Amino acid sequence: MNEKEKIMKKTILYYLLPFAFYLMPFLGYAQSFQWIKDGGSAENLGSNDYEQVYSIATDSQKNVYVLSKVGMSNLNVDGNPKTNYDNPSSFPTDIVLASFSCDGTYRWSKIIGGSGTENISSVQVDSQDNVYVAGRIASCDNGSVSQPYPGRIENDYTFSNASNACSLIFLAKFDTNGVFQYIKRPQLPTTSSNAITYTASFNFQIQDDILYWFVWLPPGTYADGAFTNSTSETHAPYVLKYNLDGSFIEATQLGNIQGIFSIIVNYYRNPNNGFYYMTFAKTSSTTFTINGQPVVNAAALVCYDNNGNLLWKRENTQAMAGSLVIYSLDFDPQNNIYIGGKIAGAAIDSFMGFTASFSSPAFVMKLDATADNLLWASHHSTVATSGYGALVYNGNEIAFTGWCAGTNFTWGTQSIYVTATNEGQDVLLARFDSTTGSCLSLHNITSTVGSTDRGTAITVDASGDYLVGGGFAALIYDTNGNSVTNEGGTTDFFIAKFATEPCSPLSNETFETNTIKVYPNPARNVLTVAINENTNYELYTITGQLVKQGKLTTIDNTIAVQDLSKGYYLLRIGNENGNWQSIKVLKE
Protein backbone atom coordinates (compact mmCIF):
# COMPACT_ATOMS: atom_id res chain seq x y z
CA MET A 1 0.00 0.00 0.00
CA ASN A 2 1.53 3.33 -1.06
CA GLU A 3 1.54 6.43 1.10
CA LYS A 4 -1.44 8.04 -0.63
CA GLU A 5 -3.54 4.90 -0.13
CA LYS A 6 -2.59 4.83 3.55
CA ILE A 7 -3.63 8.46 3.93
CA MET A 8 -6.94 7.79 2.19
CA LYS A 9 -7.68 4.79 4.42
CA LYS A 10 -7.04 6.91 7.50
CA THR A 11 -9.17 9.75 6.11
CA ILE A 12 -12.08 7.45 5.33
CA LEU A 13 -11.90 5.87 8.78
CA TYR A 14 -11.73 9.31 10.39
CA TYR A 15 -14.85 10.51 8.63
CA LEU A 16 -16.93 7.36 8.62
CA LEU A 17 -16.25 5.60 11.92
CA PRO A 18 -17.98 8.32 13.99
CA PHE A 19 -21.01 7.68 11.81
CA ALA A 20 -21.11 3.92 12.24
CA PHE A 21 -24.69 4.10 13.47
CA TYR A 22 -25.98 5.23 10.11
CA LEU A 23 -24.23 2.29 8.49
CA MET A 24 -25.95 -0.19 10.81
CA PRO A 25 -28.81 -0.91 8.42
CA PHE A 26 -26.23 -2.14 5.92
CA LEU A 27 -24.27 -4.16 8.47
CA GLY A 28 -27.20 -6.14 9.81
CA TYR A 29 -27.83 -4.33 13.09
CA ALA A 30 -31.38 -4.57 14.37
CA GLN A 31 -33.82 -1.87 13.38
CA SER A 32 -37.22 -1.27 14.92
CA PHE A 33 -39.93 1.37 15.14
CA GLN A 34 -38.22 3.99 17.31
CA TRP A 35 -41.01 6.56 17.54
CA ILE A 36 -44.60 7.12 16.41
CA LYS A 37 -46.54 10.39 16.13
CA ASP A 38 -50.17 10.86 15.19
CA GLY A 39 -52.93 13.29 14.38
CA GLY A 40 -56.55 13.44 13.31
CA SER A 41 -60.06 14.08 14.50
CA ALA A 42 -62.81 12.27 16.39
CA GLU A 43 -65.03 11.57 13.39
CA ASN A 44 -65.33 9.51 10.24
CA LEU A 45 -64.68 11.04 6.85
CA GLY A 46 -67.13 10.66 3.98
CA SER A 47 -66.92 8.69 0.72
CA ASN A 48 -64.67 5.95 2.10
CA ASP A 49 -61.96 8.47 2.98
CA TYR A 50 -59.66 7.93 5.93
CA GLU A 51 -57.31 9.89 8.12
CA GLN A 52 -54.05 8.28 6.97
CA VAL A 53 -50.72 9.53 5.68
CA TYR A 54 -50.47 9.28 1.90
CA SER A 55 -47.27 11.25 1.18
CA ILE A 56 -43.98 11.65 3.10
CA ALA A 57 -40.85 13.72 2.43
CA THR A 58 -37.65 14.29 4.41
CA ASP A 59 -34.94 16.94 4.17
CA SER A 60 -31.17 17.14 4.67
CA GLN A 61 -31.61 17.45 8.44
CA LYS A 62 -34.00 14.47 8.45
CA ASN A 63 -37.02 16.55 9.35
CA VAL A 64 -40.19 14.78 8.23
CA TYR A 65 -43.16 16.20 6.29
CA VAL A 66 -46.46 14.34 5.82
CA LEU A 67 -49.86 14.82 4.18
CA SER A 68 -53.13 13.33 5.42
CA LYS A 69 -56.84 13.97 5.11
CA VAL A 70 -58.40 15.07 8.41
CA GLY A 71 -61.84 15.71 9.88
CA MET A 72 -63.11 18.47 12.17
CA SER A 73 -64.05 17.40 15.72
CA ASN A 74 -61.13 17.57 18.18
CA LEU A 75 -58.70 17.94 15.27
CA ASN A 76 -55.08 17.97 16.44
CA VAL A 77 -51.56 17.04 15.38
CA ASP A 78 -49.54 15.42 18.18
CA GLY A 79 -51.84 17.14 20.68
CA ASN A 80 -51.65 20.57 19.01
CA PRO A 81 -55.21 21.81 18.21
CA LYS A 82 -55.99 22.63 14.58
CA THR A 83 -58.96 24.13 12.72
CA ASN A 84 -60.87 22.47 9.88
CA TYR A 85 -62.23 25.00 7.33
CA ASP A 86 -64.84 22.81 5.62
CA ASN A 87 -68.62 23.02 5.88
CA PRO A 88 -69.35 21.28 9.22
CA SER A 89 -72.70 19.93 8.04
CA SER A 90 -71.42 17.20 5.71
CA PHE A 91 -68.39 15.02 6.55
CA PRO A 92 -65.94 17.96 6.79
CA THR A 93 -62.62 16.93 5.25
CA ASP A 94 -59.45 19.02 4.86
CA ILE A 95 -55.75 18.23 4.31
CA VAL A 96 -53.01 18.61 6.91
CA LEU A 97 -49.36 19.25 6.06
CA ALA A 98 -47.41 18.41 9.22
CA SER A 99 -43.72 18.43 10.07
CA PHE A 100 -41.76 16.54 12.72
CA SER A 101 -38.06 16.62 13.58
CA CYS A 102 -35.63 13.73 13.23
CA ASP A 103 -36.52 12.42 16.71
CA GLY A 104 -40.28 12.84 16.18
CA THR A 105 -40.73 16.19 17.91
CA TYR A 106 -43.64 18.19 16.48
CA ARG A 107 -42.45 21.24 14.49
CA TRP A 108 -45.40 22.83 12.67
CA SER A 109 -48.49 22.10 10.59
CA LYS A 110 -50.82 23.74 8.08
CA ILE A 111 -54.44 22.96 7.29
CA ILE A 112 -55.35 23.29 3.60
CA GLY A 113 -59.11 23.33 3.31
CA GLY A 114 -62.45 24.86 2.54
CA SER A 115 -65.72 23.49 1.21
CA GLY A 116 -65.52 19.95 -0.18
CA THR A 117 -62.64 17.47 -0.27
CA GLU A 118 -59.31 18.83 -1.47
CA ASN A 119 -56.80 16.81 -3.51
CA ILE A 120 -53.23 17.69 -2.49
CA SER A 121 -51.22 15.08 -4.33
CA SER A 122 -47.83 15.04 -2.58
CA VAL A 123 -45.30 16.92 -0.47
CA GLN A 124 -41.76 17.48 -1.78
CA VAL A 125 -38.52 19.06 -0.51
CA ASP A 126 -35.78 20.81 -2.49
CA SER A 127 -32.00 20.79 -1.90
CA GLN A 128 -32.27 23.81 0.41
CA ASP A 129 -34.97 22.12 2.55
CA ASN A 130 -37.85 24.25 1.30
CA VAL A 131 -41.21 22.46 1.25
CA TYR A 132 -43.73 22.29 -1.61
CA VAL A 133 -47.25 20.97 -2.12
CA ALA A 134 -49.37 20.92 -5.25
CA GLY A 135 -52.98 19.98 -5.80
CA ARG A 136 -56.53 21.23 -6.20
CA ILE A 137 -58.98 22.80 -3.79
CA ALA A 138 -62.51 21.49 -4.02
CA SER A 139 -64.90 24.35 -4.73
CA CYS A 140 -65.34 27.81 -6.21
CA ASP A 141 -66.84 29.26 -2.99
CA ASN A 142 -66.19 32.99 -2.77
CA GLY A 143 -66.40 33.54 0.99
CA SER A 144 -69.74 35.34 0.88
CA VAL A 145 -72.58 34.78 3.32
CA SER A 146 -74.06 32.16 1.01
CA GLN A 147 -70.65 30.57 0.30
CA PRO A 148 -68.74 30.98 3.56
CA TYR A 149 -66.12 28.24 3.10
CA PRO A 150 -63.58 29.38 0.48
CA GLY A 151 -60.40 27.43 -0.13
CA ARG A 152 -57.54 28.51 2.11
CA ILE A 153 -54.13 27.64 3.53
CA GLU A 154 -54.77 28.55 7.18
CA ASN A 155 -54.12 32.28 7.53
CA ASP A 156 -51.42 32.31 4.84
CA TYR A 157 -53.63 32.48 1.77
CA THR A 158 -57.32 32.53 0.80
CA PHE A 159 -58.38 31.55 -2.72
CA SER A 160 -60.36 34.24 -4.51
CA ASN A 161 -62.95 32.49 -6.70
CA ALA A 162 -66.45 32.78 -8.14
CA SER A 163 -68.67 30.37 -10.05
CA ASN A 164 -67.91 32.13 -13.35
CA ALA A 165 -64.25 32.92 -12.55
CA CYS A 166 -62.77 29.91 -10.80
CA SER A 167 -59.22 28.55 -10.59
CA LEU A 168 -58.59 25.58 -8.31
CA ILE A 169 -55.18 23.99 -9.01
CA PHE A 170 -52.18 25.45 -7.19
CA LEU A 171 -48.53 25.02 -6.25
CA ALA A 172 -47.40 26.39 -2.86
CA LYS A 173 -43.96 26.80 -1.27
CA PHE A 174 -42.96 27.06 2.41
CA ASP A 175 -39.54 27.30 3.99
CA THR A 176 -38.34 24.53 6.30
CA ASN A 177 -39.99 26.24 9.28
CA GLY A 178 -43.38 26.42 7.57
CA VAL A 179 -43.24 30.10 6.60
CA PHE A 180 -45.33 30.66 3.47
CA GLN A 181 -43.25 31.76 0.46
CA TYR A 182 -45.52 31.85 -2.60
CA ILE A 183 -48.43 30.29 -4.44
CA LYS A 184 -48.77 29.65 -8.18
CA ARG A 185 -52.17 29.19 -9.85
CA PRO A 186 -51.48 28.38 -13.52
CA GLN A 187 -55.12 28.19 -14.63
CA LEU A 188 -56.74 31.50 -15.53
CA PRO A 189 -60.20 32.04 -13.99
CA THR A 190 -62.69 29.90 -15.90
CA THR A 191 -66.15 28.40 -15.48
CA SER A 192 -66.80 26.18 -12.52
CA SER A 193 -67.43 23.29 -14.95
CA ASN A 194 -63.96 23.63 -16.47
CA ALA A 195 -62.30 24.11 -13.09
CA ILE A 196 -64.07 21.23 -11.33
CA THR A 197 -64.99 18.66 -14.00
CA TYR A 198 -62.15 18.89 -16.51
CA THR A 199 -59.17 20.03 -14.40
CA ALA A 200 -57.25 17.61 -12.20
CA SER A 201 -53.99 17.48 -10.26
CA PHE A 202 -52.01 14.29 -9.79
CA ASN A 203 -48.51 13.52 -8.56
CA PHE A 204 -45.89 16.20 -7.97
CA GLN A 205 -42.11 15.59 -7.81
CA ILE A 206 -38.86 17.56 -7.39
CA GLN A 207 -35.78 16.16 -9.12
CA ASP A 208 -32.47 18.06 -9.37
CA ASP A 209 -34.34 21.12 -8.10
CA ILE A 210 -36.83 21.15 -10.99
CA LEU A 211 -40.54 20.86 -10.13
CA TYR A 212 -42.61 18.39 -12.17
CA TRP A 213 -46.37 18.68 -11.69
CA PHE A 214 -48.77 16.28 -13.43
CA VAL A 215 -52.16 17.74 -14.32
CA TRP A 216 -55.14 17.33 -16.67
CA LEU A 217 -56.20 20.59 -18.27
CA PRO A 218 -59.13 21.67 -20.46
CA PRO A 219 -58.43 23.81 -23.55
CA GLY A 220 -57.21 27.29 -22.66
CA THR A 221 -54.21 29.47 -21.84
CA TYR A 222 -52.10 28.80 -18.75
CA ALA A 223 -49.15 30.06 -16.68
CA ASP A 224 -49.78 33.74 -17.41
CA GLY A 225 -49.99 33.05 -21.13
CA ALA A 226 -46.82 30.94 -21.30
CA PHE A 227 -48.55 28.03 -23.04
CA THR A 228 -51.88 27.13 -24.62
CA ASN A 229 -53.69 23.82 -24.58
CA SER A 230 -55.40 23.70 -27.96
CA THR A 231 -56.54 20.08 -27.85
CA SER A 232 -59.95 19.22 -29.23
CA GLU A 233 -60.59 16.93 -26.26
CA THR A 234 -62.31 18.07 -23.08
CA HIS A 235 -58.98 17.76 -21.26
CA ALA A 236 -55.39 16.67 -21.87
CA PRO A 237 -52.56 15.40 -19.61
CA TYR A 238 -49.55 17.65 -19.07
CA VAL A 239 -46.48 17.84 -16.90
CA LEU A 240 -45.83 21.44 -15.83
CA LYS A 241 -42.20 22.31 -15.03
CA TYR A 242 -41.12 25.10 -12.67
CA ASN A 243 -37.93 26.45 -11.17
CA LEU A 244 -37.68 26.64 -7.39
CA ASP A 245 -38.49 30.36 -7.44
CA GLY A 246 -41.83 29.57 -9.05
CA SER A 247 -40.89 30.71 -12.54
CA PHE A 248 -42.55 28.58 -15.22
CA ILE A 249 -40.24 26.60 -17.54
CA GLU A 250 -42.47 24.67 -19.94
CA ALA A 251 -45.36 22.25 -20.31
CA THR A 252 -45.03 18.81 -21.91
CA GLN A 253 -48.18 17.10 -23.12
CA LEU A 254 -48.33 13.39 -22.28
CA GLY A 255 -50.32 12.18 -25.26
CA ASN A 256 -54.12 12.31 -25.36
CA ILE A 257 -56.87 10.74 -23.30
CA GLN A 258 -60.50 10.38 -24.25
CA GLY A 259 -63.64 9.85 -22.22
CA ILE A 260 -65.03 10.76 -18.83
CA PHE A 261 -64.37 7.81 -16.60
CA SER A 262 -64.01 6.50 -13.08
CA ILE A 263 -60.36 5.58 -12.67
CA ILE A 264 -57.54 5.85 -10.15
CA VAL A 265 -54.60 7.61 -11.84
CA ASN A 266 -51.07 8.52 -10.88
CA TYR A 267 -47.96 9.74 -12.68
CA TYR A 268 -44.24 9.35 -12.01
CA ARG A 269 -41.01 10.64 -13.55
CA ASN A 270 -37.95 8.38 -13.66
CA PRO A 271 -35.08 10.68 -12.61
CA ASN A 272 -32.52 8.52 -14.41
CA ASN A 273 -33.85 8.61 -17.98
CA GLY A 274 -36.43 11.41 -17.73
CA PHE A 275 -39.30 9.19 -18.90
CA TYR A 276 -42.83 9.59 -17.56
CA TYR A 277 -45.06 6.76 -16.35
CA MET A 278 -48.80 6.61 -15.75
CA THR A 279 -50.61 3.99 -13.71
CA PHE A 280 -54.36 3.65 -13.71
CA ALA A 281 -57.05 1.31 -12.47
CA LYS A 282 -60.71 1.42 -13.49
CA THR A 283 -63.30 1.57 -10.74
CA SER A 284 -66.17 0.79 -13.11
CA SER A 285 -66.65 -0.59 -16.61
CA THR A 286 -66.10 2.69 -18.45
CA THR A 287 -64.57 3.61 -21.79
CA PHE A 288 -61.00 4.88 -21.68
CA THR A 289 -58.56 5.45 -24.54
CA ILE A 290 -54.95 6.65 -24.66
CA ASN A 291 -53.79 8.24 -27.93
CA GLY A 292 -56.78 6.60 -29.57
CA GLN A 293 -55.87 3.15 -28.26
CA PRO A 294 -58.70 1.61 -26.21
CA VAL A 295 -57.86 0.30 -22.78
CA VAL A 296 -59.60 -3.06 -22.70
CA ASN A 297 -58.83 -4.35 -19.23
CA ALA A 298 -58.98 -3.02 -15.70
CA ALA A 299 -55.52 -1.52 -15.23
CA ALA A 300 -52.29 -0.65 -16.99
CA LEU A 301 -48.79 0.79 -16.76
CA VAL A 302 -48.05 3.36 -19.48
CA CYS A 303 -44.72 4.95 -20.45
CA TYR A 304 -43.97 8.22 -22.28
CA ASP A 305 -40.54 9.48 -23.32
CA ASN A 306 -39.18 12.80 -22.06
CA ASN A 307 -40.94 14.60 -24.93
CA GLY A 308 -44.31 13.10 -24.02
CA ASN A 309 -44.47 10.53 -26.82
CA LEU A 310 -46.27 7.30 -25.95
CA LEU A 311 -43.72 4.44 -25.88
CA TRP A 312 -45.67 1.46 -24.58
CA LYS A 313 -48.68 0.28 -22.59
CA ARG A 314 -48.86 -2.88 -20.44
CA GLU A 315 -52.32 -4.07 -19.36
CA ASN A 316 -53.50 -6.82 -17.06
CA THR A 317 -55.63 -9.63 -18.50
CA GLN A 318 -58.86 -9.14 -16.53
CA ALA A 319 -61.54 -6.54 -17.32
CA MET A 320 -63.17 -6.67 -13.87
CA ALA A 321 -62.72 -3.33 -12.09
CA GLY A 322 -60.35 -3.56 -9.14
CA SER A 323 -58.69 -6.80 -10.24
CA LEU A 324 -55.31 -5.03 -10.40
CA VAL A 325 -54.31 -1.92 -8.44
CA ILE A 326 -50.81 -0.41 -8.57
CA TYR A 327 -49.97 1.40 -5.32
CA SER A 328 -46.64 2.93 -6.33
CA LEU A 329 -43.63 2.81 -8.66
CA ASP A 330 -39.91 3.36 -8.19
CA PHE A 331 -36.82 3.05 -10.37
CA ASP A 332 -33.16 2.08 -10.06
CA PRO A 333 -30.17 3.61 -11.93
CA GLN A 334 -30.53 0.93 -14.63
CA ASN A 335 -34.13 2.12 -15.20
CA ASN A 336 -35.63 -1.13 -13.95
CA ILE A 337 -39.17 -0.60 -12.68
CA TYR A 338 -40.35 -1.65 -9.21
CA ILE A 339 -44.09 -2.01 -8.59
CA GLY A 340 -46.12 -2.47 -5.43
CA GLY A 341 -49.78 -3.36 -5.73
CA LYS A 342 -52.52 -5.94 -5.31
CA ILE A 343 -53.94 -8.46 -7.77
CA ALA A 344 -57.07 -10.60 -7.86
CA GLY A 345 -56.50 -14.12 -6.60
CA ALA A 346 -57.49 -17.61 -7.73
CA ALA A 347 -55.43 -16.95 -10.88
CA ILE A 348 -58.33 -15.00 -12.44
CA ASP A 349 -56.00 -12.12 -13.35
CA SER A 350 -52.46 -11.84 -14.65
CA PHE A 351 -50.03 -8.95 -15.07
CA MET A 352 -46.75 -9.46 -16.91
CA GLY A 353 -47.31 -13.20 -16.49
CA PHE A 354 -47.66 -12.93 -12.70
CA THR A 355 -50.69 -14.47 -10.96
CA ALA A 356 -51.79 -15.12 -7.37
CA SER A 357 -53.42 -18.23 -5.98
CA PHE A 358 -55.58 -16.68 -3.22
CA SER A 359 -57.75 -13.64 -2.72
CA SER A 360 -56.22 -10.25 -3.63
CA PRO A 361 -52.75 -10.41 -2.07
CA ALA A 362 -50.31 -7.51 -2.13
CA PHE A 363 -47.31 -8.04 -4.37
CA VAL A 364 -43.94 -6.54 -5.24
CA MET A 365 -42.52 -6.82 -8.74
CA LYS A 366 -39.45 -5.86 -10.79
CA LEU A 367 -39.63 -5.24 -14.56
CA ASP A 368 -36.85 -4.38 -16.96
CA ALA A 369 -36.59 -0.84 -18.33
CA THR A 370 -38.97 -1.45 -21.25
CA ALA A 371 -41.42 -3.61 -19.27
CA ASP A 372 -40.84 -6.41 -21.76
CA ASN A 373 -39.60 -8.83 -19.13
CA LEU A 374 -40.69 -9.71 -15.62
CA LEU A 375 -37.46 -10.04 -13.60
CA TRP A 376 -39.10 -11.20 -10.38
CA ALA A 377 -42.35 -10.94 -8.45
CA SER A 378 -43.74 -12.28 -5.20
CA HIS A 379 -46.69 -12.02 -2.85
CA HIS A 380 -47.25 -13.07 0.74
CA SER A 381 -48.51 -16.60 1.25
CA THR A 382 -51.08 -15.96 3.96
CA VAL A 383 -54.21 -13.84 3.71
CA ALA A 384 -53.67 -10.15 4.56
CA THR A 385 -52.38 -6.79 3.31
CA SER A 386 -54.68 -6.18 0.34
CA GLY A 387 -56.23 -2.77 -0.22
CA TYR A 388 -53.45 -0.42 0.84
CA GLY A 389 -49.72 -0.13 0.41
CA ALA A 390 -46.63 1.70 -0.86
CA LEU A 391 -43.13 0.81 -2.04
CA VAL A 392 -39.72 2.50 -2.15
CA TYR A 393 -36.37 1.59 -3.76
CA ASN A 394 -33.42 1.81 -1.37
CA GLY A 395 -30.32 0.61 -3.21
CA ASN A 396 -29.80 -3.04 -2.42
CA GLU A 397 -33.33 -3.45 -1.14
CA ILE A 398 -36.98 -2.65 -1.73
CA ALA A 399 -39.27 -1.78 1.18
CA PHE A 400 -43.04 -2.26 1.10
CA THR A 401 -45.66 -1.22 3.64
CA GLY A 402 -49.24 -2.42 3.91
CA TRP A 403 -50.90 -4.53 6.58
CA CYS A 404 -50.54 -8.02 8.00
CA ALA A 405 -52.45 -10.35 10.31
CA GLY A 406 -52.51 -13.83 11.77
CA THR A 407 -50.32 -16.12 13.82
CA ASN A 408 -47.93 -16.95 10.99
CA PHE A 409 -47.80 -14.18 8.40
CA THR A 410 -45.38 -15.37 5.73
CA TRP A 411 -43.69 -13.80 2.73
CA GLY A 412 -41.07 -15.94 1.02
CA THR A 413 -38.82 -17.46 3.67
CA GLN A 414 -39.78 -14.92 6.36
CA SER A 415 -42.59 -15.35 8.91
CA ILE A 416 -43.81 -13.37 11.92
CA TYR A 417 -46.53 -13.66 14.54
CA VAL A 418 -48.84 -10.66 14.24
CA THR A 419 -52.19 -11.29 15.94
CA ALA A 420 -54.35 -14.16 17.02
CA THR A 421 -56.84 -15.33 14.42
CA ASN A 422 -59.57 -12.75 13.68
CA GLU A 423 -58.09 -10.25 16.14
CA GLY A 424 -57.34 -7.35 13.82
CA GLN A 425 -54.41 -6.31 11.66
CA ASP A 426 -51.11 -4.47 12.10
CA VAL A 427 -48.99 -2.18 9.95
CA LEU A 428 -46.50 -4.16 7.85
CA LEU A 429 -42.97 -3.26 6.77
CA ALA A 430 -41.46 -5.87 4.43
CA ARG A 431 -37.94 -5.66 2.97
CA PHE A 432 -36.76 -7.41 -0.21
CA ASP A 433 -33.47 -7.90 -2.03
CA SER A 434 -33.76 -5.62 -5.05
CA THR A 435 -31.73 -7.99 -7.25
CA THR A 436 -33.36 -11.33 -6.45
CA GLY A 437 -36.69 -10.36 -4.88
CA SER A 438 -36.00 -12.52 -1.83
CA CYS A 439 -37.81 -11.34 1.29
CA LEU A 440 -35.22 -10.13 3.80
CA SER A 441 -37.38 -9.34 6.83
CA LEU A 442 -40.91 -8.68 8.06
CA HIS A 443 -41.87 -6.20 10.78
CA ASN A 444 -45.16 -5.05 12.29
CA ILE A 445 -46.21 -2.14 14.50
CA THR A 446 -47.79 -3.58 17.62
CA SER A 447 -51.39 -2.58 18.27
CA THR A 448 -54.27 -3.33 20.62
CA VAL A 449 -56.36 -6.43 19.96
CA GLY A 450 -58.89 -5.91 17.17
CA SER A 451 -57.30 -2.77 15.75
CA THR A 452 -57.36 -2.38 11.96
CA ASP A 453 -54.16 -0.57 10.99
CA ARG A 454 -52.30 -0.17 7.69
CA GLY A 455 -49.25 1.40 6.14
CA THR A 456 -50.01 3.64 3.15
CA ALA A 457 -46.80 5.64 2.53
CA ILE A 458 -43.06 5.06 2.89
CA THR A 459 -39.79 6.89 2.20
CA VAL A 460 -36.09 6.82 3.14
CA ASP A 461 -34.27 9.58 5.04
CA ALA A 462 -30.67 10.77 4.81
CA SER A 463 -29.45 8.05 7.19
CA GLY A 464 -31.08 5.28 5.17
CA ASP A 465 -33.81 4.87 7.80
CA TYR A 466 -37.43 4.27 6.79
CA LEU A 467 -40.36 6.55 7.54
CA VAL A 468 -43.67 4.69 7.42
CA GLY A 469 -47.05 6.43 7.48
CA GLY A 470 -50.62 5.22 7.46
CA GLY A 471 -53.78 4.99 9.51
CA PHE A 472 -54.65 3.23 12.78
CA ALA A 473 -57.93 2.45 14.50
CA ALA A 474 -57.21 2.19 18.22
CA LEU A 475 -53.75 2.27 19.82
CA ILE A 476 -50.27 1.49 18.45
CA TYR A 477 -46.85 1.24 20.13
CA ASP A 478 -43.25 1.91 19.18
CA THR A 479 -40.41 -0.34 20.28
CA ASN A 480 -39.81 1.77 23.41
CA GLY A 481 -43.35 1.25 24.71
CA ASN A 482 -44.62 4.71 23.77
CA SER A 483 -48.12 4.73 22.28
CA VAL A 484 -50.54 6.94 20.37
CA THR A 485 -54.33 6.69 20.63
CA ASN A 486 -57.05 7.24 18.04
CA GLU A 487 -59.18 10.32 18.82
CA GLY A 488 -62.26 8.57 17.41
CA GLY A 489 -63.67 7.68 14.03
CA THR A 490 -62.39 4.92 11.76
CA THR A 491 -58.72 5.93 11.80
CA ASP A 492 -56.24 8.62 12.79
CA PHE A 493 -53.04 9.15 10.82
CA PHE A 494 -49.58 8.16 12.08
CA ILE A 495 -45.93 8.57 11.09
CA ALA A 496 -43.27 6.20 12.46
CA LYS A 497 -39.50 5.83 12.08
CA PHE A 498 -37.88 2.43 11.51
CA ALA A 499 -34.25 2.76 12.58
CA THR A 500 -31.58 1.71 15.07
CA GLU A 501 -32.18 4.78 17.25
CA PRO A 502 -34.67 7.68 17.34
CA CYS A 503 -32.38 10.06 15.42
CA SER A 504 -29.41 8.44 13.71
CA PRO A 505 -26.41 10.71 12.99
CA LEU A 506 -26.62 12.55 9.70
CA SER A 507 -25.22 10.63 6.77
CA ASN A 508 -25.65 13.49 4.34
CA GLU A 509 -24.36 16.55 6.13
CA THR A 510 -23.71 19.32 3.63
CA PHE A 511 -20.04 20.27 3.97
CA GLU A 512 -19.64 23.99 4.00
CA THR A 513 -16.67 26.29 4.53
CA ASN A 514 -16.03 29.81 3.36
CA THR A 515 -15.39 28.51 -0.17
CA ILE A 516 -17.12 25.16 -0.70
CA LYS A 517 -20.69 23.91 -0.67
CA VAL A 518 -21.97 20.64 -2.15
CA TYR A 519 -25.58 20.11 -3.20
CA PRO A 520 -27.98 18.39 -3.55
CA ASN A 521 -26.89 15.91 -0.93
CA PRO A 522 -28.19 13.22 -1.23
CA ALA A 523 -27.99 13.32 -5.05
CA ARG A 524 -29.44 11.12 -7.78
CA ASN A 525 -27.74 12.36 -10.95
CA VAL A 526 -25.41 15.31 -10.43
CA LEU A 527 -23.45 16.81 -7.54
CA THR A 528 -22.80 20.55 -7.79
CA VAL A 529 -19.75 21.95 -5.98
CA ALA A 530 -19.97 25.69 -5.31
CA ILE A 531 -16.38 26.98 -5.43
CA ASN A 532 -14.61 30.28 -6.01
CA GLU A 533 -11.36 28.82 -7.42
CA ASN A 534 -10.28 25.95 -9.65
CA THR A 535 -10.01 22.63 -7.78
CA ASN A 536 -9.33 18.94 -8.24
CA TYR A 537 -11.67 16.28 -6.92
CA GLU A 538 -11.52 12.60 -6.01
CA LEU A 539 -14.53 10.45 -5.14
CA TYR A 540 -14.03 7.29 -3.06
CA THR A 541 -16.25 4.48 -1.84
CA ILE A 542 -16.34 3.84 1.90
CA THR A 543 -13.87 0.99 1.35
CA GLY A 544 -11.34 3.37 -0.17
CA GLN A 545 -11.81 2.58 -3.87
CA LEU A 546 -11.32 5.59 -6.16
CA VAL A 547 -14.34 5.74 -8.51
CA LYS A 548 -14.06 9.24 -10.01
CA GLN A 549 -11.54 12.05 -10.27
CA GLY A 550 -11.14 15.22 -12.29
CA LYS A 551 -11.02 19.00 -12.27
CA LEU A 552 -13.66 21.56 -11.35
CA THR A 553 -13.88 25.22 -12.28
CA THR A 554 -16.21 27.99 -11.21
CA ILE A 555 -18.10 27.41 -14.48
CA ASP A 556 -17.82 23.63 -14.92
CA ASN A 557 -18.49 22.60 -11.33
CA THR A 558 -20.63 19.46 -11.51
CA ILE A 559 -19.88 15.77 -10.98
CA ALA A 560 -22.06 13.16 -12.70
CA VAL A 561 -23.02 10.39 -10.26
CA GLN A 562 -26.00 8.76 -11.97
CA ASP A 563 -23.98 5.65 -12.86
CA LEU A 564 -22.73 5.07 -9.31
CA SER A 565 -24.29 2.54 -6.98
CA LYS A 566 -26.49 3.91 -4.23
CA GLY A 567 -24.65 4.50 -0.96
CA TYR A 568 -22.12 6.65 0.88
CA TYR A 569 -19.00 8.18 -0.68
CA LEU A 570 -16.14 10.42 0.39
CA LEU A 571 -15.55 13.43 -1.86
CA ARG A 572 -12.12 15.10 -1.59
CA ILE A 573 -11.72 18.65 -2.90
CA GLY A 574 -8.22 20.10 -3.34
CA ASN A 575 -7.09 23.52 -4.52
CA GLU A 576 -4.01 24.40 -6.58
CA ASN A 577 -1.98 24.89 -3.39
CA GLY A 578 -2.49 21.25 -2.45
CA ASN A 579 -4.96 21.88 0.38
CA TRP A 580 -7.59 19.11 0.53
CA GLN A 581 -10.90 18.89 2.35
CA SER A 582 -13.13 15.82 2.64
CA ILE A 583 -16.91 15.75 2.36
CA LYS A 584 -19.37 12.93 2.98
CA VAL A 585 -21.95 12.54 0.19
CA LEU A 586 -24.85 10.16 -0.35
CA LYS A 587 -25.87 8.78 -3.75
CA GLU A 588 -29.61 8.02 -3.88
Label the predicted regions:
Residues M1-W35, N508, E512, N521, ...:
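Bacterial Sec-dependent N-terminal signal peptides
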Residues K4, L16-A30, K173, G220, ...:
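Low-complexity, intrinsically disordered/propeptide-like segments
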Residues K6, T11-Y15, F21-P25, E43, ...:
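Intrinsic-disorder/low-complexity peptide segments enriched for small residues
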Residues P18, D129, N335, E397, ...:
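Short, intrinsically disordered/low-complexity patches at protein termini
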Residues P18, E51, T199, L324, ...:
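Short beta-strand-initiation
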Residues Y29-E509:
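A sequence-level/structural motif corresponding to short, flexible coil/turn segments enriched
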